[in-house]
Amino acid sequence: MTGVTPTVPPTLLDGRAVIVTGAARGVGRGIASALLTRGASVLAVDCDEQLLAATVEALAEGARPVRALPADLRDPTSAQRIVAAAVDAFGTVHGLVNNAIATNEPKRFQDITREDYDLVFDVGPRATFELMQAVYPILLGNGGGSIVNLGSGSGTLGKPKFGAYAGAKEAIRGISKAAAMEWARDGIRVNVVCPFAESDGIRAWREMAPEAYERSLRSVPMGRLGDVGTDIGPVVCFLLSDESRYVTAQTVMVDGGTAGFR
């Protein structure tokens, strides 16, 4: 239809409380912003305390409440502490977005160290696993809920010089599928979003490997990178909302067509 301007439904997630990890920058910040615009309350979690405070201050200009919680996801007590903080702030939790990741890549596969491997797996799949376990009883008590975990085309398609990162992201997809199958009868949905968007990680890659970056950009059928707030965030909001109540165990490629139905 022509002449129709898309509008954001401000009540899509009205009354929902959502945890977002890695929320200080990039994709996480874009998701948090989109959630707040659609009526959710957000607990923003990140290890960068100073940047997180600045992000939350900016996001707090809207009508919905947003709280900051600095946390190192490598700490084995962090998952329970994060969920407890969300319940304390908002009374309950309806959704979880596991976005946080850390990596020392790009590196050649043979140069990746145990420390590199441990970093990306601890902040990625292990923290994702533990946060899902920690939030489960809260979601169950609410009669259900939704979890969105962030994957990556680096894993689904394979990206040279991101061996550990790709493995960690595919581990997150495996965890997500298993939980989705097990928790479906509990009313808890689990899905994965794989974004290709302008972010700190993408910018770092562009600086380190500009030719590879340009090749990758040319491979996007839509001809551009996604915007974290207006392209990635809305898809996550949809998956957290009742509009997607029959959607679980799916990987959604929000990449401008790069994956091409693979």
Can you annotate each of these PLM segments?
Residues 2-9, 103-106, 157, 237, ...:
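Short C-terminal tail/terminal secondary-structure segment
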Residues 122, 210-230:
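Catalytic Tyr-x(3-8)-Lys segment
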Residues 152:
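Residue(s) in the substrate-gating loop at a strand-loop-helix junction
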Residues 129-132, 144, 225-254, 259-260:
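C-terminal substrate-recognition "lid" of short-chain dehydrogenase/reductases
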Residues 132, 168, 176:
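Active-site helix of classical SDR
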Residues 184, 189, 247-249:
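Short, small/polar-rich loop/turn modules that mediate ligand/substrate recognition or access, typified
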Residues 107-109, 113-118, 216:
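Substrate-binding pocket helix/loop in short-chain dehydrogenase/reductase
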